[in-house]
Amino acid sequence: MHPRFQTAFAQLADNLQSALAPILADHHFPAMLTAEQVSTLKNTAGLDEDALAFALLPLAAACARTDLSHFNVGAIARGVSGNWYFGANMEFLGTTMQQTVHAEQSAISHAWLRGEKGLAAVTVNYTPCGHCRQFMNELNSGLDLRIHLPGRAPHTLRDYLPDAFGPKDLEIKTLLMDEQDHGFTLTGDTLTQAAITAANKSHMPYSHSPSGVALECKDGRIFTGSYAENAAFNPTLPPLQGALNLLSLNGYDYADIQRAILAEKGDAALIQWDATAATLKALGCHNIDRVLLG
């Protein structure tokens, strides 16, 4: 078990501990539960779906990287597939506050990058900030997405974001978590191809500036992130943050990164290179390359 989970795990009910122990035994537990695992945990612990999600929130919050605020937020995105995806907030010292990943963004991008096609609900231990409410409004679940908070009745995103502005106001039909493939040809080595594949998945209907990042760890593991734009622009999630989020949720540290590649168009309206390189260098990675999409 990764050390970050030990305190939260010890506070769980005994029957839930017994069911979770073999799942968490892997140091690189992927911070997600399959639909089958969720069903097993519900039956073993005698909890319904909502109660189980609340019980597991401390494990999600344990994934937080909060060197600045020391305020850990955890979220669980429940996919329409039945799979559950952990998320937690991330802060990066030596960069800027704009590089921060919020817990809801973490869980949602986690689900998206693992191929989830839509979300039924998000469970979070603190009320979503306005930034996250706007981020969630880009999803194909729209304002019907259910939000669950401890000690409160469940509500929809519509309740948390009245008179919402979103992609439909801009006549955008393809939404975040809809399947997308921009068709850029895969070239280069495995890591380069992973970055291009991530760029092909980008949600960028406003700038038309696709980008993807691939991070290679010292043990050969590769994590990718795709660019996810938002109708309100500022809640947009850069591709590097998506990749760093997956890396961290899987129990790796920034020091494990040995190489990084950004794939983007050289003549795009928005360029990720400077911000990507600066953030990676602040985290200790200097082996950074860029491949231009054709």
Curated annotation (Swiss-Prot):
E.C. code: 3.5.4.5
Limits of the CMP/dCMP-type deaminase domain: 48-168, 186-294
Catalytic activity: cytidine + H2O + H(+) = uridine + NH4(+); 2'-deoxycytidine + H2O + H(+) = 2'-deoxyuridine + NH4(+)
Sites where the protein binds Zn(2+): 102, 129, 132
Keywords: Hydrolase, Metal-binding, Zinc
Active-site positions on this chain: 104
Residues reported in the UniProt entry to bind substrate: 89-91
Top-level taxon in the UniProt lineage: Bacteria
GO molecular function per UniProt: cytidine deaminase activity; identical protein binding; zinc ion binding
Similarity annotation: Belongs to the cytidine and deoxycytidylate deaminase family.
Oligomeric and partner information: Homodimer.
Protein name according to UniProt: Cytidine deaminase
Organism expressing this protein natively: Salmonella schwarzengrund (strain CVM19633)
High-level lineage: Bacteria, Pseudomonadati, Pseudomonadota, Gammaproteobacteria, Enterobacterales
Gene for this chain: cdd
